[in-house]
């Protein structure tokens, strides 16, 4: 089993690489790539951690050596948010980075499961899909926008508000991965109820949690450690599914049947070829139904922006 991290020298990439080095199954290979010359050194640093995960690091313009034989590719390359920026401001820089890396994935390991972390995810996943399609290798069951950070944040915030053990809380989050497109389904959390005011303020906090971190870091970065954990959780779920474990379920932003938008985050059953089944979002409260219909225009615009970038 080989996992490749593209963008491995950044804040998210290094946190993700550390978690994978300590949590991937014994005998796995972990390959790190970044344009930054420090990347082989990150691999050397991690190689001193005594786990049975073989590690290698590559830098420069060409990601091919890192991608050869990859089963899972996790992409965190790009610039991070700074105060005053929203995820869409990142588009101008990150769109080109994702296009370039996906072209290399298409040429080197077209059958790999691909997880996109690079923001704006609503748009970068559409870019990746169009690039893969142009290369004739697109399989919508193998491409994922990683929205797990919204889920772990929702779990943490609900546990804090309701005095629950965070490990026991599981909040489904649907829609997209920025601002109003993030929709936590608080009505579906078992054993917990929320009044209208709690629902509204908690939903808003989950939607704006990225900004909370950017502002708290006072210009010193964005959410790197929690995102590294979220990406590791999702990447490890893909690995478990590839190894044949049954009942691996995670939410992610994927191309579906287009019921709400071409790409949409929903619960997925994962298997050896990626997505086995897109699970329905279930029954929504009136608040959630309204939030869903209100966000769709924004989500569709984000998707169109990505599609048009590749044309």
Swiss-Prot record:
One of its GO terms (molecular function) is L-malate dehydrogenase (NAD+) activity. It comes from the Bacteria. One of its GO terms (cellular component) is cytoplasm. Pfam families: Ldh_1_C, Ldh_1_N. NAD(+) binds at residues 7-13, 34, 94, 117-119, 227. Substrate binds at residues 81, 87, 119, 153. The active site is at residue 177. Keywords: NAD, Oxidoreductase, Tricarboxylic acid cycle. GO terms for biological process: malate metabolic process; tricarboxylic acid cycle. It catalyses: (S)-malate + NAD(+) = oxaloacetate + NADH + H(+). Its EC number is 1.1.1.37. InterPro entries: L-lactate/malate_DH, Lactate/malate_DH_C, Lactate/malate_DH_N, Lactate_DH/Glyco_Ohase_4_C, Malate_DH_AS, Malate_DH_type1, Malate_DH_type1_bac, NAD(P)-bd_dom_sf. Belongs to the LDH/MDH superfamily. MDH type 1 family. Homodimer. Catalyzes the reversible oxidation of malate to oxaloacetate. This is Malate dehydrogenase. The lineage of its organism: Bacteria, Pseudomonadati, Pseudomonadota, Gammaproteobacteria, Enterobacterales.
